[in-house]
Amino acid sequence: MGVDITILVGTMTGTAEMVAQEVLQALETAGHQGTIQVMDNLDAGVFQPGGNFLICTSTYGNGDVPDNAQALFNSLETGRPNLSNVIYGLIALGDTTYKDTFCQGGIRFDKMLAELGAKRAGEMLRHDASSGTLPEELAAQWVVPWVEQHLAPLQQAQDKLTSEMA
């Protein structure tokens, strides 16, 4: 049985959403399920009651999360919900031309989610817009191995723990 993942998209220009669409297609081809939610008007409630999440976000300005992700980020920051039932991964988009803020949108989400008890599966995928590679192609190649090597084992361990506590 495949893994079910919610892909949350923070974007300014639509690139992260395009990446998410390619990622979802790769997941579905490999027998997994997923949904895409653009972060517009989302709050921390999106993470309840838990589950598997993939944050796909660009970086904007001086290392900020995109405008459409601000409400969600602020909700996490002020509400401080317990996210111990959340397993997540990250696709961070940036440009090394801005080396001091490269992929900071993703890094900020990573730090916040970890502070709130969420468990990150594997390492963050960082795409450099100056690299000459297309972010959607890189992410589509990355996501299925990420699920199978990192996310699925964490989900199985969490499911076992939950059933033992029931």
Where would I find each of the regions flagged by the language model?
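Domain-level signal for soluble alpha/beta catalytic cores
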Residues: 4-8, 19, 35, 41, ...
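A short, well-structured beta->alpha microelement
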Residues: 28-46
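Active-site neighborhood of thiol-dependent amide/isopeptide-bond enzymes
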Residues: 9-13
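FMN-binding flavodoxin-like domain, especially the glycine-rich phosphate-binding loop
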Residues: 2-4, 14-18, 26-30, 49-166
